[in-house]
Regions:
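Beta-strand-rich recognition/accessory modules
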Residues: 62, 93-133
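N-terminal functional modules and adjacent low-complexity/disordered segments of proteins
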Residues: 31, 66, 87, 104, ...
Length: 133
């Protein structure tokens, strides 16, 4: 697994990711970063409207990438496919995924105290978008 800055043993030892803000408006934010080095630039766009929240990812090279959605402990997954994840809160419609997996995870609610939760791992190459709502 790669992180967006080069890290070793919990200490940053490599160069920091360079982030460029492309758009910042009340309903849309878009930026890219080069923190994956030779793996290319990662570009992400967030769009919100009255009915949904949309996230679009693109990676400049053809590497296999993973987008993570960390769920709150009270969110339950009702069904999951490569194109749609249904929870007890909302539906997530996915376009561009090569696969989707649900993994057990933990979220910290205070120092050194955790709740069990789920994380959605969406695997893709080049482009991915998902809409929540």
């Amino acid at each position: 697994d790669k992180n967006s800055s080069e890290v070793w043993g919990g200490f940053r030892v490599g160069r920091r990711a360079r982030v460029t803000l492309l758009k910042d408006s009340p309903n849309e934010v878009e930026a890219w970063h080069d923190g994956f080095g030779s793996l290319g630039r990662h570009r992400r766009k967030f769009t919100i409207d009255k009915d949904c929240f949309r996230i679009e990812d693109s990676v400049s090279t053809g590497v296999k990438a993973v987008s993570l959605i960390h769920l709150a402990p009270d969110v339950e997954i009702m069904s999951c496919s490569r194109t749609e994840i249904v929870t007890n809160i909302a539906a997530i419609r996915v376009a561009g995924a090569s696969s989707v997996e649900i993994v057990d995870d933990q979220v910290s609610f205070t120092y050194n105290r955790f709740h069990l939760s789920k994380t959605i791992r969406i695997h893709f190459v080049k482009r991915l978008s998902y809409t929540i709502g």
